[in-house]
Amino acid sequence: MKFFIDTANLEQIQEAYDLGVLDGVTTNPSLMAKEGIKGTENQREHYIKICKIVNADVSAEVIATDYEGMIREGEELAALNPHIVVKVPCIADGIKAIKYFTEKGIRTNCTLVFSVGQALLAAKAGATYVSPFVGRLDDICEDGVGLVGDIVRMYRTYDYKTQVLAASIRNTKHIIECVEVGADVATCPLSAIKGLLNHPLTDSGLKKFLEDYKKVNG
């Protein structure tokens, strides 16, 4: 499984990269706003900074919701850096835009996916990634991880090349469950990635080793 970090915070991206396990970054307008990055030019400069840190896939989302606007923004974003993946919402014009980008060799991430049907359309349009939102489905008492598994099975059945990028991951439990159902990628906050390290037996075992070492070596 690949690990992407879901943030626009440069310090967190650098910390995740320094762990040696980071495969990419996902961003969205809300994450940009959280970092106080305003204006188109400032946001695009920020994407370039992220690309320089990770040297890997960085999903940058279009703001437009109409076909022509998404095409214009997507081409501008893709021109910023070869690692940019254009993030497009799963709406009718978005699917059309993904098809266009696919034909132009521009990689895409179909976002805001909440059903197998949406994931099917994204794959048929040639999306590089599809992003089912695990946590948001859980919030309304639906099975987010179950959807990820359903999409994985569908893609394998029909040999679609679109990668399943599990998004809206809230915790380590979500990550492990997405691993178990075969997601290609999990994008998550830094806290969830670091949380995978935590286990009481690791802590107690390390403490015991150090205590025993001191007994022998003083």
From Swiss-Prot:
It comes from the Bacteria. It is found in: Cytoplasm. Its EC number is 2.2.1.2. InterPro entries: Aldolase_TIM, TAL/FSA, Transaldolase_3B, Transaldolase_3B/F6P_aldolase, Transaldolase_AS, TSA/FSA_arc/bac. Pathway: Carbohydrate degradation; pentose phosphate pathway; D-glyceraldehyde 3-phosphate and beta-D-fructose 6-phosphate from D-ribose 5-phosphate and D-xylulose 5-phosphate (non-oxidative stage): step 2/3. GO terms for molecular function: aldehyde-lyase activity; transaldolase activity. The active site is at residue 87. The keyword Cytoplasm applies. It is an enzyme of class 2 (transferase). One of its GO terms (cellular component) is cytoplasm. SUPFAM superfamilies: Aldolase. It catalyses: D-sedoheptulose 7-phosphate + D-glyceraldehyde 3-phosphate = D-erythrose 4-phosphate + beta-D-fructose 6-phosphate. One of its GO terms (biological process) is carbohydrate metabolic process. Keywords: Cytoplasm, Pentose shunt, Schiff base, Transferase. HAMAP family: Transaldolase_3b. Transaldolase is important for the balance of metabolites in the pentose-phosphate pathway. PANTHER family: FRUCTOSE-6-PHOSPHATE ALDOLASE 1-RELATED, TRANSALDOLASE. Belongs to the transaldolase family. Type 3B subfamily. This is Probable transaldolase.
